[in-house]
């Protein structure tokens, strides 16, 4: 995981960089972020066009392509390392009106009542507005558990 920013209440946002980290997040939060991470990873690797046809040089640039192409997956952690919320932001953390930002708590519950200040801080870091009505997919409905 990669440190992104500190948040109020002794909380920290980290970027989920690998499928293994996504699997741990899914287990800790009892939701399906691993599935979405894997789908995004596969789509990004599938869209990669190497600059060279040489076998040896084929994958140079793949990692940076993946980081530019796939959504940013993040986890909010407390000081003990406990998972509090999971976020999926547009590729590069840049505004994209076509992209549905998702922020959920454990078991896809609403993270805003307990972590709104931390979510706001993440939005400030990326220059995004992360309002509940836009980012919590189950507002006004019962969450899907997986």
Where are these regions (language model features)?
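Catalytic-core elements of nucleic-acid end-processing and repair enzymes
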Residues: 1-146
């Amino acid at each position: 995981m990669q440190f992104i920013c500190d948040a109020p209440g002794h909380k920290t946002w980290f970027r989920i960089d690998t499928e293994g980290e996504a699997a741990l997040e899914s287990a800790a939060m009892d939701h399906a972020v691993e599935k979405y991470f894997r789908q995004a990873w596969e789509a990004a690797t599938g869209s990669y066009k190497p600059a060279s046809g040489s076998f040896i040089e084929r994958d140079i640039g793949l990692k940076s392509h993946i980081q530019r192409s796939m959504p940013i997956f993040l986890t909010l952690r407390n000081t003990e390392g406990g998972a509090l919320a999971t976020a999926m932001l547009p590729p590069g953390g840049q505004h994209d009106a076509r992209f549905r930002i998702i922020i959920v708590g454990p078991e896809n519950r609403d993270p805003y009542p307990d972590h709104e200040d931390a979510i706001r801080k993440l939005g400030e870091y990326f220059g995004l507005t992360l309002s509940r009505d836009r980012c919590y997919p189950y507002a006004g409905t019962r969450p899907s558990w997986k």
